[in-house]
Amino acid sequence: MNKAIFLDRDGTLNIDYGYVHEIDNFKFIDGVIDALRELKKMGYMLVLVTNQSGIARGYFSEDQFLQLTEWMDWSLAEQDVDLDGIYYCPHHSEGKGEYKEDCDCRKPKSGMLLQAIKELKIDPTQSIMVGDKVEDLKAGIGAKVKMNVLVRTGKPVTGEGEGIADYVLDSIVDLPRILKRLKK
């Protein structure tokens, strides 16, 4: 069984400008790539789990999302960071057409994490969810991951978020240091 870091995207890995779907508007948060590289060296799989309601709302197409995701994946790979899995939810209960759905994959539900756990043979009791919203943490809790980490690089941290997070960090950049300290 593998251990993994489940990663939200917008506000965790990249600056959240709102419905980011174009390469020109995608900017990694300072230090994120180095942190991801360090987490890989520590033996963690890196698994992206991202809600993309902009697809359901008609703000951008699934093809536009996939094009940006492919670019992001290549950008990381060029810097020795390989994502082991990419999972996304294009649905929203108030969406349009085929994407209007109250699904099991949209965080705070745990469907994306549970699918990754099954497909990638991940041990949730050795794994971590990192995100900038309560919904991210609730998905991690529902999937029974070992640790849920809230980062301050996206949405404002709420009291509810602080209450359910195992750690609240300024950025994912701080996570490798915390994990090394806990290992001692």
From Swiss-Prot:
GO molecular function: D-glycero-beta-D-manno-heptose 1,7-bisphosphate 7-phosphatase activity; magnesium ion binding; zinc ion binding
Metabolic or biological pathway, per its Swiss-Prot or TrEMBL entry: Nucleotide-sugar biosynthesis; ADP-L-glycero-beta-D-manno-heptose biosynthesis; ADP-L-glycero-beta-D-manno-heptose from D-glycero-beta-D-manno-heptose 7-phosphate: step 2/4; Bacterial outer membrane biogenesis; LOS core biosynthesis
GO process terms (BP): ADP-L-glycero-beta-D-manno-heptose biosynthetic process; carbohydrate metabolic process
Pfam families named in the record: Hydrolase (PF00702)
This protein's GO CC annotations: cytoplasm
Site feature Contributes to substrate recognition, where: 106
Binding-site residues for Zn(2+), renumbered to this chain: 89, 91, 103, 105
Binding annotation for substrate: 8-10, 16-19, 50-53, 106-107, 133
Localization: Cytoplasm
Annotated catalysed reactions: D-glycero-beta-D-manno-heptose 1,7-bisphosphate + H2O = D-glycero-beta-D-manno-heptose 1-phosphate + phosphate
Needed co-factor(s): Mg(2+); Zn(2+)
Keywords: Carbohydrate metabolism, Cytoplasm, Hydrolase, Magnesium, Metal-binding, Zinc
Residues the record marks as site: Stabilizes the phosphoryl group: 50, 107
Residues annotated as catalytic: 8 (nucleophile), 10 (proton donor)
EC number annotated for this UniProt entry: 3.1.3.82
Annotated positions binding Mg(2+): 8, 10, 132
UniProt function note: Also catalyzes the dephosphorylation of D-glycero-alpha-D-manno-heptose 1,7-bisphosphate, phosphoserine and fructose-1,6-biphosphate in vitro.
PANTHER family: D-GLYCERO-BETA-D-MANNO-HEPTOSE-1,7-BISPHOSPHATE 7-PHOSPHATASE
Subunit structure: Monomer.
Family recorded in the similarity comment: Belongs to the GmhB family.
Name by which UniProt lists this protein: D-glycero-beta-D-manno-heptose-1,7-bisphosphate 7-phosphatase
Organism field: Haemophilus influenzae (strain ATCC 51907 / DSM 11121 / KW20 / Rd)
Taxonomic classification: Bacteria, Pseudomonadati, Pseudomonadota, Gammaproteobacteria, Pasteurellales
